[in-house]
Amino acid sequence: MSEVEYRCFVGGLAWATNDEDLQRTFSQFGDVIDSKIINDRESGRSRGFGFVTFKDEKAMRDAIEEMNGKELDGRVITVNEAQSRGSGGGGGGRGGSGGGYRSGGGGGYSGGGGGGYSGGGGGGYERRSGGYGSGGGGGGRGYGGGGRREGGGYGGGDGGSYGGGGGGW
């Protein structure tokens, strides 16, 4: 798909928030082409994040500016630019820095910055400051994070998750 998509990643959503709620909330910034909450394949329950696709870039930028860190359905949400699925490492998608699965920057599962499971910075299980078995301040990005035995993961050096030097179990 060569066409540019103006899509936002939205993380930290309440379980009760649905596609229509996203559409309604974000349509104040411009024409919403699509809004989708990602559900767990097995349980069918919301995974706490989704995507909103806008018709134009200005609407997307305005939504990111206005909604990131704001409250929706009683939860503070993370909103940032989602990268196209094909872009790979540099800019986002899986394993990149923008949004979406395993993002480095903003939210989602294994997110480095925003919430999400195994998040390095803010929120989620095994985060740096709080969560299951975390060291409360040192490296630690969940299992084996931060370059094994050097600040995270099993037996980590300073403040990682399980068995980290600065705390943990």
Swiss-Prot record:
UniProt keyword Ribonucleoprotein, yes or no: no
Induction of its expression: Up-regulated by cold stress. Circadian regulation. Induced by hydrogen peroxide (at the protein level).
SMART domains membership: RRM
Tissues of expression: Ubiquitous.
Gene3D superfamilies noted in UniProt: 3.30.70.330
Positions of region (Nuclear targeting sequence (M9)): 95-143
Occurrences of domain RRM (ranges): 6-84
GO MF annotations, alphabetized: miRNA binding; mRNA binding; single-stranded RNA binding; siRNA binding
Membrane spanning residue stretches: none
InterPro entries linked: Nucleotide-bd_a/b_plait_sf, RBD_domain_sf, RRM2_NsCP33-like, RRM_dom, SLIRP/GR-RBP-like
Region annotation (Disordered) ranges: 80-99, 130-169
Location of region: Glycine-rich (GR) required for cell-to-cell movement: 86-168
Sequence positions bearing ADP-ribosylarginine: 47
Entry-annotated residues carrying Phosphoserine: 103
Record keywords: ADP-ribosylation, Cytoplasm, mRNA processing, mRNA splicing, Nucleus, Phosphoprotein, RNA-binding, Secreted
Matches recorded under SUPFAM superfamilies: RNA-binding domain, RBD
The keyword Nucleus is assigned to this record: yes
Family: Belongs to the GR-RBP family.
Domain remark in the UniProt entry: The glycine-rich (GR) domain is necessary and sufficient for cell-to-cell movement and to interefere with zucchini yellow mosaic virus (ZYMV) infection.
Subunit note: Interacts with TRN1. Binds to small phloem-mobile single-stranded RNAs (ss-sRNA, e.g. small interfering RNA (siRNA) and microRNA (miRNA)) in the phloeme exudate, including viral-derived sRNA (vsiRNA).
Protein's UniProt name: Glycine-rich RNA-binding protein 8
